[in-house]
Amino acid sequence: MSFRQKRTRIPLLAMTVTALAAAVCGVTTAPAATGAEVAVPLSVGAAAGNATPIPGYVIQSSAQVSDDSAVSKPGFPTSGWYPVSSRSTVYAGLLQNGKYADPFYSTNMQNVPAAQFSVPWWYRTDLNVDDTSSRTYLDFSGVLSKADVWVNGTKVATKDQVNGAYTRHDLDITAQVHTGVNSVAFKVYPNDPNRDLSMGWIDWAQTPPDQNMGIVRDVLVRRSGAVALRSAHVIQKLNSALDHADLTVKADVRNDSANAVQTTVAGTVAGKPISQTVSLAAKERKTVTFPLVGLDRPNVWWPAGMGGQHRYDLDLTASVGGTPSDAAKSKFGVRDVKATLNSSGGRQYSVNGKPLLIRGGGYTPDLFLRWNETAAADKLKYVLNLGLNTVRLEGHIEPDEFFDIADDLGVLTMPGWECCDKWEGQVNGEEKGEPWVESDYPIAKASMFSEAERLRDHPSVISFHIGSDFAPDRRIEQGYLDAMKAADFLLPVIPAASARPSPITGASGMKMNGPYDYVPPVYWYDKSQKDRGGAWSFNSETSAGVDIPTMDTLKRMMSASELDTMWKNPSAKQYHRSSSDTFGNLKLFGDALTKRYGASANLNDFVRKAQLSQYENVRAEFESHSRNYTDSTNPSTGLIYWMLNSPWTSLHWQLFDAYMDQNGAYYGAKKANEPLHIQYSHDNRSVVVINQTSNAVSGLTATTKLYNLDGTEKYSNTKTGLSVGALGAKATAVTVPAVSGLSTTYLAKWVLTDSSGKEVSRNVYWLSTKADTLNWGGSDWYYTPQSAFADLSGLNNLGQSAVGATANSVAGADGTTTTTVTLKNTSGGRLPAFYVDSKVVDSAGKPVLPVEWNDNAVSLWPGETTTLTAKYRTADLKGSKPSVRISGWNTGTQTVPADGSGPGPSDPVDYQAEDATIVQGAVESNHAGYTGTGFVNYDNVAGSSVEWTVTVPSAGTYDVVVRYANGTTTSRPLDFSVNGSISASGVAFGSTGTWPAWTTKTVRVTLAAGVNKIKAVATTANGGPNVDKITL
């Protein structure tokens, strides 16, 4: 918003702010707040240009209110009302007050009575005004979806006037305001995205029970003199040489007094003075256009990785008789954006004359629209950590601060309207969303004007989608275009995210052909299927659907029985996938996982196989588009992965989850989007080097190696002297020939080194001699079935390997800590340590999130070493010392200290029971006090066992410290064996009193240097104790 000033946010109450922060993180345990009121009314200053956000409200159902006019009268009793933050839906406010259990867990949200949200809810607050000589306004948008507005007992706007989530309102309440305490109240009406031009959740997640009714943006209390200054902005035009920009400053001045006035509007733009005097009749409004300002050698704004992110300031004051009346401040960037159609009809974006491949994801806010600036910044930092450059916002257009963050980070944004509800109800046939009535047209036009005004000066914004699945009809489109013209929104306008054209703007240059559910990696490379989602043109939203989170997150979001159903019966309805029947289960994904990787033995096995599947699929999706970007015909020009993140704890459409944890999909995307990258083509076996940096590179060496699963090398090739251009250019290193004697499942490793021999890219694939074959003729809009499946089940028999690990941490002055982890394959033989994942954890074994790794999910052959770094907020350790939990497909799990003191040979290493091999037992989490993601509950049978794979640097005697619980009154003995030989028999594990009471037992064993297997076997019909972990 061009006139929005930077400000310090004013807390509602310390208690409620803390509760909100917890709620945004998915924790909804907050102090009860019934009977509480806002402690002190907001003091509203009288200075010209003062814009103070209302810090919070108390809310209550209108069913509890008998007299509407009384609510906004000072002194109205609000005992029993709920204090909420400045931007809060009704349900979010009730969560903030601890009224309902964590909605991110299990089916808790399903149990919330929805009837209470079928009536309006009141939002009430008090303002303290000491000086009424200034005029007073309420300036706001973000009401879902309509409201009556009351001030001091007077209705100043009706729900027919305040209608639409994006419409902006500037209510002059000067006549209602008096000295002292004043009261403002919004009567917010129920939201229905199918009937209202607001926000809905389509098939992304379960719909909140209140459908997000509430106020989700700031309401500003503005003060000014007779003349109000609005809509200050800069139209900038950058020349092709990037060495000069012309700046045109415009602003609206409005005389709200009953007398004619003369006002002088003066200030600076990019440090250069400007001034103009204007005469205004009573109640007259004029647009002031200042003379052109030239800017030589401007600091041009660039996307991240292409240059800097400089922004200039605009600072204006409107004065009457030499006295300031109103003021406006804003920032803007100097840059040029184009989005033209190439010869194949695809949409090609360029910034400052440089074409670029759009690589992004579909962004979503929190399911309850709870704004958290830190969380939003974390998400956009993940975008850069992934190597992406763009986010698409389909509806749910975030507040001003979001775009400020994107501007500062250099993340491109593609906002636009959403599909599948009222926004497209006039044009989408039988799909959801009611057809428009006459009153919808001005609301849509006003929404477009408001958002265009707000977004136009943000250099991160590169276009606006006026349609998603469907383009608007002529009347709707003309309204949008007229609004954009009036708002001086000069960026590209995209008629639809699909291939549907609009009557005026014409072709979209984009496609939305799916898939949205499982397809194999080879799918993405096929350009011959013109109605499918392969890597050609601009793919505005697509993915292989399911993205299973890590076990850490799954334990936080689903009950034990739900997790059991998830892996045993993927065809069952999954509440945490989607409300849609099409995407309500995991059947397509589960079937493919079993056919390609083999049947899952247990939950852990299902989850780890899911990570491999997601990694290979997401990697292929991005790699195929990067490879095809420079094709001479029908190139790929953009890919928006569906989606970047999920609004809640979800099983699909996410590169990272609601808790910011990173799964296989994340690391597959990160690998594919390395700045300088070597990759394999699933369709034609070519090995290609992609350079996404701004500089050409030469002197590269590409090495190819193929291995059977027993470690035998079957093919090797080295290509030297490779050169590759900049900004998405590619060079082919080799095409892998047919190789005889490969195992059905085999491994491939590609390494790219620079002219100094330094490794700059490593990429490991697990492949099959049996191909995935697609049945294109059986395609549906959301997936394409397979007639044959690759066989990757050989990975289940990959022999054990060993990883040695050391870690160290350094806390920085900026409040972050960097943990460095060095991994080495210490096994003898030929087997790699495959898919080794590292996590920074706190003293309780919980992941420290968010975290930015330079690389992860790595594979190392014997003797190979890699060093990883992880950066995170020191405060997220919550006072504990960091450790690193390291788990690999064939290495077991270990936890090494990383507390900054430096690891030594005697440092203990933890091995979690839930990551071990379990026979006749189950991983559970129903008793508190465990570490990691759970514990093992032995079946009540002799012979049930847990077997850990451990690594030690040298042969000798070691203490195995077993952390266990036994809630019975009898001992549950275990036999311990090492590498198949009994080491300790009948070790007693006595009662601990209760199951949540944990203690330790030490068992001394003799281990060989390198990899060992330690098995603990129950010797009685009672089975063993619950085992949390062993520490070696």
Swiss-Prot record:
GO molecular function: carbohydrate binding; exo-1,4-beta-D-glucosaminidase activity; hydrolase activity, hydrolyzing O-glycosyl compounds
Keyword Signal: yes
Active site: D469 (proton donor), E541 (nucleophile)
Principal subcellular localisation of the protein: secreted
Dependence of activity on temperature: Optimum temperature is 60 degrees Celsius. Stable below 50 degrees Celsius, inactive above 60 degrees Celsius.
Subcellular location: Secreted
Residue intervals of the CBM6 domain: 909-1032
Chemical reaction(s) catalysed: Hydrolysis of chitosan or chitosan oligosaccharides to remove successive D-glucosamine residues from the non-reducing termini
InterPro entries for this protein: Beta-gal/glucu_dom_sf (IPR036156), Beta-mannosidase-like_N2 (IPR054593), CBM6 (IPR005084), EBDG/EBM (IPR043534), Galactose-bd-like_sf (IPR008979), Glyco_hydro_2_Ig-like (IPR006102), Glycoside_hydrolase_SF (IPR017853), Ig-like_fold (IPR013783)
Keywords: Carbohydrate metabolism, Chitin degradation, Glycosidase, Hydrolase, Polysaccharide degradation, Secreted, Signal
Entry's EC annotation: 3.2.1.165
Annotated spans, Disordered: 883-908
GO cellular component: extracellular region
Pfam family, one: Glyco_hydro_2
Signal peptide: 1-32
Function noted in UniProt: Hydrolyzes chitosan and chitooligosaccharides with retention of anomeric configuration. Has maximum activity on chitotetraose, chitopentaose and their corresponding alcohols, with a slight decrease in the rate of hydrolysis on longer chains. Has no activity against beta-D-glucopyranoside, beta-D-xylopyranoside, beta-D-mannoside, beta-D-glucuronide, beta-D-galactoside, beta-D-N-acetylgalactosamide, beta-D-N-acetylglucosaminide and alpha-D-N-acetylglucosaminide.
Family: Belongs to the glycosyl hydrolase 2 family.
Name this protein carries in UniProt: Exo-beta-D-glucosaminidase
